[in-house]
């Protein structure tokens, strides 16, 4: 080794402290029976077919239309 070369010593690796913690795995899945029994009528709808077509003649709709019309006549 020459005078200009310096010896580089590798640093000791720092190992993270490992705690002796017991890992409790709660990954067990509970199995449930199927809700659909054989031969059962499955025609029951989850949602109403007309869920987005509410009554357009209810009180709220009438008040809303009147308010919109009054604001549109004010701007004109």
Swiss-Prot record:
Annotated GO CC locations: proteasome complex; proteasome regulatory particle, lid subcomplex
GO biological process, one term: double-strand break repair via homologous recombination
Pfam families: DSS1_SEM1 (PF05160)
Annotated stretches, region: Disordered: 30-62
Biased composition (Acidic residues): 30-40, 47-57
InterPro entries, alphabetized: DSS1_SEM1
Keywords: Proteasome
Membership in a protein family: Belongs to the DSS1/SEM1 family.
Subunit composition and interactions: Part of the 26S proteasome.
Function text: Subunit of the 26S proteasome which plays a role in ubiquitin-dependent proteolysis.
UniProt protein name: Probable 26S proteasome complex subunit sem1
Native organism: Dictyostelium discoideum (Social amoeba)
